[in-house]
């Protein structure tokens, strides 16, 4: 039974899932909004909001922690210097998920995740 299980497996190994969330986070940072499947968007929301909350402190240790999670210097700098200060007065809810369509090939529910 999977009662109270804390995250979605997304039918991937743990390393693959970590790489997926990292790559989606980098894309969201660069573009501001991306289209993906609904379960991926819901899992990404949790991951990305933790990044922004951590970056809100603005100290060097937060910068290092975010770089450790993303391994992408440009995205790390963007989150710490541009995105996090914009949400300094906000307690969570940095992203929005909008359900869009059913994908033609496999009828998967698609969604747009964007920064508020």
Curated annotation (Swiss-Prot):
An example Gene Ontology biological process: translation
What GO terms are given for molecular function?
structural constituent of ribosome
Keyword Ribosomal protein on entry: yes
Cite the InterPro entries for this sequence: Ribosomal_bL17, Ribosomal_bL17_sf
Q: Which Pfam families match?
A: Ribosomal_L17
Classify the source by domain of life: Bacteria
Single GO cellular component term: cytosolic large ribosomal subunit
Concerning Gene3D superfamilies, the annotation shows:
Ribosomal protein L17
**UniProt keyword list:** Ribonucleoprotein, Ribosomal protein
Q: Which SUPFAM superfamilies match?
A: Prokaryotic ribosomal protein L17 (SSF64263)
Keyword S-adenosyl-L-methionine recorded: no
Which protein family is it in?
Belongs to the bacterial ribosomal protein bL17 family.
Q: How does it assemble?
A: Part of the 50S ribosomal subunit. Contacts protein L32.
Q: What is this protein called?
A: Large ribosomal subunit protein bL17
Q: Which organism is it from?
A: Sulfurovum sp. (strain NBC37-1)
Gene designation per UniProt: rplQ
């Amino acid at each position: 039974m999977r009662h109270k299980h804390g995250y979605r497996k997304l039918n991937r190994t743990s390393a693959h899932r970590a790489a997926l969330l990292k790559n989606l986070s980098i894309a969201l940072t660069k573009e501001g909004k991306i289209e993906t499947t609904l379960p991926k968007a819901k899992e990404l929301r949790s991951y990305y909001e933790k990044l922004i909350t951590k970056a809100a402190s603005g100290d060097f240790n937060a910068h290092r922690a975010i770089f450790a999670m993303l391994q992408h210097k440009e995205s790390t700098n963007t989150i710490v210097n541009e995105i996090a200060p914009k949400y300094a007065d906000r307690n969570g809810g940095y992203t929005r998920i909008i359900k869009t369509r059913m994908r033609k090939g496999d009828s998967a529910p698609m969604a747009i995740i964007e920064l508020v």
